[in-house]
Amino acid sequence: MKKKYVLLAAFAAAMLTPSVVWAQYPQITDEAKENYKKMMTEERKRSDEAWAKALPIVQKEAREGRPYIPWAGRPYDLPQADIPSFPGAEGGGMYSFGGRGGKVIVVTSLEDSGPGTLREACETGGARIIVFNVAGVIRLKSPISVRAPYVTIAGQTAPGDGICVTGQSFLIDTHDVVIRHMRFRRGAQDVAFRDDAVGGNAVGNIMVDHCSASWGLDENMSIYRHVYNRGADGHGLKLPTVNITIQNSIFSEALDTYNHAFGATIGGYNSMFCRNLFASNISRNSSVGMDLSLIHISEP
């Protein structure tokens, strides 16, 4: 019996050595790490510049009745519409304003950035409804971050086979966002950057309907909490996302580059997760993160 315990202890110790623990993680070169660091530094600078242009518009609309509330952490912190975002909307996010009543922006280019692109439309300030007159694949060189609130992305308006966003992450970093009929395929384009296909710091009033997210390097989707930076000290307050609906969507084929091929982490307050399909992920189909007030409905 003593010999058995010794063997088990030796096996456990071997399994906990760094070479074994990290065996399934990619060996990232110093050059790749530096390239990633440079890319993200440039992207944060560019995103901050876009936000600096959008913020005055957001503040102006806030004075006119569309409040900007990045500190929301309870369902009643965010006002909601009197009617659903669209016929068939359900759950906590069904009364998201999205871009209702705002300007219509037409995506005319499949390029990563520039005039007529999805990135430009997402980074614009003010309530907006984003529609498409092109179809195809949008190959991102850096993540798209939606920071200005009150936006509807109507993927169903695209002709042909619709829109697929690939190459980098799509990040929801605000409130009152409606996304419908979109495909997100993160992909392992840069192993130094491990992130979700769809994620970010979603504040609340979020509706995702008839979308699919695949090939995430962390998870295919994470919507359950956000970090509110109250000042310039860099210390953020972690808060639950509120008023969320993820419905009629598919989360599949997460990539195992980091031994982390996970489906989704969901949570937050006043959330509904219904009629969604998980396929070919190793775990988290789905998992619950942080605080929770959730209705989770799975139907064939």
Indicate where each model-derived feature is located.
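Extracellular beta-strand-rich solenoid/capping regions of secreted or surface-exposed proteins
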Residues: 118-126, 138-154, 163-180, 186-204
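Extracellular beta-strand/beta-solenoid scaffold signature
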Residues: 165-170, 191-200, 215-241, 257-268, ...
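Feature marks extracellular polysaccharide-active and adherence modules
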Residues: 133, 154-159, 180, 185, ...
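Bacterial N-terminal signal peptides
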Residues: 9-17
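Carboxylate/His-rich catalytic cores and anion/metal-binding grooves
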Residues: 241, 246-247
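Surface-exposed loop/turn segments connecting beta-strands in extracellular beta-rich domains
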Residues: 156, 161, 166, 182-188, ...
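Residue-level detector of conserved catalytic or cofactor/ligand-binding positions
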Residues: 293-300
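Extracellular "leader-to-stem" segments immediately downstream of a signal peptide or signal-anchor
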Residues: 2-6, 19-111, 115-129
